[in-house]
C-alpha cells in the first residue's frame, strides 16, 4: 500500500539529520508544519509556499490504513509528491507536542517582497514581539478580523517557528506576512494614518477614534513597547481604557481589542449606510 513511500529508520540518515536541524530553527528558509489540521490548511490555502516533503509516522499511518474515512489516510492519498515514512522514535524527535497526529510537512514559506505591500490598505505592524504564543495569537486575530496584511520588524520572533504555527492554528495561510522589515523606513512610505499602542500622556482613547477608514496599527515589544524611532513617526498614540488595578494588557489581547473595535465600527457604518437608503 505504501510502495511509493521512502522508509527511514536510522537516526544517521542525512535527510533525517536535516529535519532535526529544521525543527530546531537552524534553517531560516524552511519550516515544519505539524498535525493534520495545519497540513490540510496548507494544501487548501497556501499561496506561494512550496511543499518540500510530506513525512508520516509509521505506526500512525498503518493504523489509519485500517480505519474508514481516516483524515490522515486522505491526506496521504491526495499528495502529488512521494511521501516519507519515519520510524516512530525518529518521528517523535521532530514533534513539538507530546501526542503527535502522525504527519509533518516540510515547507518553504513564501518570501513576500515588500513592494507587494498595499501601502493604502489596513495592516498591522509588529515591532520586536518576542513570545511565540503572542505572535501566533496576533496572526490568528489579524486573520479573524479580516485584515490581510501583517508586517513583522527585524528582531521579531520567527513567524514560522513551531510554537507560533501552533498558536496561529492555520491563520498563516489566510493573510500575507512580511518579515524582517525595517519599520523606520516603511512607515514613511505608508499612505494612511498610523496608530501606535502606548501608555503615554499624549495617547488617545481607542474609543475616541474614528476607525472606519483604513489605517496601520503598530504593536510593540512585550516589555519595551514600540521603539522610540518608530513611535515618533506614528500619527497618534492610542491606549485602551482599563481598570487601574492592572498596569497594561498583553500585546496579543490588546491586538484583539483594537482590531475588533475597528471591525465593529466598520460594520456599524455599513449597516447605517444600508438602512439609510430606505
List the predicted regions and their residue ranges.
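Boundary-proximal intrinsically disordered activation/regulatory segments immediately upstream
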Residues: 1-67, 156-158
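RNA substrate-binding interface of SAM-dependent RNA methyltransferases
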Residues: 44, 84, 111-204
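Short acidic-hydrophobic, aromatic-tinged amphipathic segments that line or gate anion-handling sites
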Residues: 5-11, 82-87, 175-183, 238
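Active-site/ligand-binding-proximal alpha/beta "capping" segment
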Residues: 196-246
